[in-house]
Amino acid sequence: MAEADREQWGYVPFEHVGPLRFGMSEAEAVVAMEAAGFTCEKETRQGHITGKVTCRRPTARGMEPDVTAYFVDHLDAKGLTCLTVDGRGGPQVTWEGVKLIGRVPSQLTAEFLACVEERDLGFGISAQGDVFPVDQGFIPATQRAGDAVVTRAMFANPEGWAFTVGDCIPEEAWDVR
């Protein structure tokens, strides 16, 4: 998808990604996403992640939803805990001036390394080998887009029920290729 065609979303770590706020209910998330022009489907789940909402723009053609939101009702946490943004057709999410979605992975890595050095942040390496700034509430990943590979991102807030951002991300979110 061309950059000019993507929705533009802001990101504040552990608070919100675009119109979605961590802790909001499934119903609130559906209202927010439908107001932004997306069509949503809800799914009830078993375990710590009790709900899933997938959202697509009406013009979406890919197999993966543009945005997938996961909800928790466990220990001291309730509501939106994790969301993923598709690299092929999802909204562009910007963190600290860095565009996270639909990028060439090596270019995003170079920007991350410059950013963590400039801001004196630490960095980690995901299970897939992607570099990311730690303690910022997101982990980048990659997925195929035809013959190319582009970046996508998984955002989470572990407050009240998990130890790390990675602990909040369901296995199926890691498996998107």
PLM features: residue spans?
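Short helix/turn-capping signatures at newly exposed starts of structured segments
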Residues: 1-177
